[in-house]
A protein has these predicted regions:
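N-terminal leader/targeting pre-sequences
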Residues: 2-7, 12-19, 24-212
Length: 212
């Protein structure tokens, strides 16, 4: 199991780190995990995500900046037993268009296991529920949702450093809108900019906040 130290983190929202630092050590069957969200597709955005696991329930807190403003940003937790458990790199660009699509990233991070919607279902079936994701006012995303039910396998993957947080939505042509990149590989009625990954990070257990 990989671990990360709370003191080594930087976050766009200092409150996230403060809350984590003041939290008591995790008890058996629970863990606090953290991911530094870094750019994919040369997108100028970054962020932090924390996922608290208690049994088969999770609480997700996420902050990011530099996203396409006032546009929906689908966000998910990904996991696949056969995946590399990491964020994609340009070598995953199999069609040679110099962009990494969501599908091209699957060998790295696996399929969607949790949809980080603002309300309603959070299952993989909501992966493209564009009307239920954060819209990043002024390019900033602030997200918190608790009580999300996951399977034992997904909870274990999060605690074991095998789950990946991905936020989608990029702006290749700098128009502040989703209108380029061709059709999405997930839904041809959407432009690729709407669904290509923007930022990504692997969830690792924070020192002193993990247990089984």
């Amino acid at each position: 199991m990989r671990r990360t130290t709370a003191l080594a983190m930087t976050a766009p929202a200092l409150g996230l780190v403060a809350a984590l630092t003041l939290a008591p050590p995790a008890s058996a069957g629970s863990a606090t995990t953290h991911a530094s969200l870094r750019p994919v597709n040369d997108h100028n955005a970054s962020g932090q995500a924390f996922v608290d696991v208690k049994g088969n329930r999770i609480t997700v807190t996420m902050a990011a900046h530099g996203l396409v403003p006032n546009q929906p940003h689908a966000a998910h937790i990904h996991f696949g037993a056969e995946a590399r458990h990491e964020c994609p790199v340009m070598a995953d660009d199999t069609d040679g268009n110099h962009h990494i699509s969501t599908t091209e990233g699957v060998p790295a991070y696996g399929p969607v296991v949790v949809s980080l919607t603002t309300f309603g279902p959070t299952d993989p079936g909501s992966a493209l529920a564009i009307d239920r994701f954060d819209t990043a006012p002024r390019g900033k995303l602030q997200y918190e949702r608790g009580g999300i039910k996951v399977s034992h396998a997904v909870a274990r993957a999060i605690e074991s450093g095998e789950a990946v947080v991905v936020v989608h939505g990029v702006d290749y042509n700098h128009t502040a809108a989703y209108d380029a990149g061709g059709p999405s590989d997930l839904d041809p009625s959407l432009p690729a900019e709407a669904t290509d990954p923007a930022i990504c990070g692997v969830l690792d257990v924070v020192d002193g906040h993990g247990g089984h």
